[in-house]
């Protein structure tokens, strides 16, 4: 499945490039990755390298562990060089380290920072979970909309809307670095919910919040403005690693899940 995700940039200042142009600032080469597809033990990844300062053509090499050259490309413009790579889970994290090597026509070259892909794609815990509940009314009656997103964590990340009794109401597994968006009808009396984000490294959940606010007030008694955030939730953390059974049990998609309890915190 195609996953559009956002780029994660790692930039390292170079020690030398073309000595003939000393008036330029110290050149840099950046390396970035984008997860295109997720497999059980692999990731189809787009890696880009860019050195914007030296004049083209620029020769880019994608190198792996022990400086082994994986791919090479000559770019005649200032556009980044792109490399498609099937990154598979290795026994040693050191085997999944990549960096860009850029050289100009003068023969000078510069390296990028190292990308630790094992950490990025398999072992990075979910962190900095943010959840926002908003009451919206676009003419068809009020609906509660929730945005749930962790700022980092290895894919795939499963996001869940959970009631205070542990009942999982909705689940999504969004694209890498994209938020989960939940929408549901509010009940006539307030209820309590939280957002949970989980990957194969850990589980993190936000604090319980009442939706809509006002305790046990009736919906018609609540006079808060529509289309304004109800609450941005703080987070609690759990560093317990999920078992394959727990992680594999999550459902993918936007449908309602009945009779399922959330993973123990």
Swiss-Prot record:
Glycans are attached at residues 86, 132. GO terms for biological process: adaptive immune response; cell surface receptor signaling pathway; immune response; mature B cell differentiation involved in immune response; positive regulation of immunoglobulin production in mucosal tissue. Transmembrane segments: none annotated. One of its GO terms (molecular function) is transmembrane signaling receptor activity. Residues 1-20 form the signal peptide. Probable B cell-associated cytokine that plays a role in the regulation of humoral immune responses. Involved in lymphocyte B cell development and immunoglobulin/IgA production. Its main location: secreted. InterPro entries: IL-40-like_Ig. Keywords: Adaptive immunity, Cytokine, Glycoprotein, Immunity, Secreted, Signal. GO terms for cellular component: external side of plasma membrane; extracellular space. It is found in: Secreted. It comes from Homo sapiens. This is Protein IL-40. Coiled coil: none annotated. The keyword Signal applies. Expressed in fetal liver and bone marrow. Expressed in peripheral blood lymphocyte B cells.
């Amino acid at each position: 499945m195609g996953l559009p995700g956002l780029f994660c940039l790692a930039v390292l200042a170079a020690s030398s490039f073309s000595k003939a142009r000393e008036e330029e600032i110290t050149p840099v080469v950046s390396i970035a990755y984008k997860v295109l597809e997720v497999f059980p033990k692999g990731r189809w990844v787009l890696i880009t390298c860019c050195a914007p300062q030296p004049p083209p053509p620029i020769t880019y090499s994608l190198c792996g562990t022990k400086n082994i050259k994986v791919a090479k490309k000559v770019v005649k413009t200032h556009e980044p060089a792109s490399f498609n790579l099937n990154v598979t889970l290795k026994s040693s994290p050191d085997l999944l380290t990549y960096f860009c090597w850029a050289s100009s026509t003068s023969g000078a070259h510069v390296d990028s920072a190292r990308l630790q892909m094992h950490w990025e794609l398999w072992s990075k815990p979910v962190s900095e979970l943010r959840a926002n509940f908003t009451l919206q009314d676009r003419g068809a009656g009020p609906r509660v909309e929730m945005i749930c997103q962790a700022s980092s964590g290895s894919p795939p990340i499963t996001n869940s809307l959970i009631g205070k009794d542990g009942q999982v109401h909705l689940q999504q597994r969004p694209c890498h670095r994209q938020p989960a968006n939940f929408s549901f009808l509010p009940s006539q009396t307030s209820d309590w919910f939280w957002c949970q984000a989980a990957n194969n490294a850990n589980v993190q959940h936000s604090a319980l919040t009442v939706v809509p606010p006002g305790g046990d007030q009736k919906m018609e008694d609540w006079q808060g403005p529509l289309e304004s955030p109800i609450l941005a939730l703080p987070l609690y953390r759990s560093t317990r690693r999920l078992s394959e059974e727990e992680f594999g049990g999550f459902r993918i998609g936007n449908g309602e899940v009945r009779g399922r309890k959330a993973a123990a915190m």
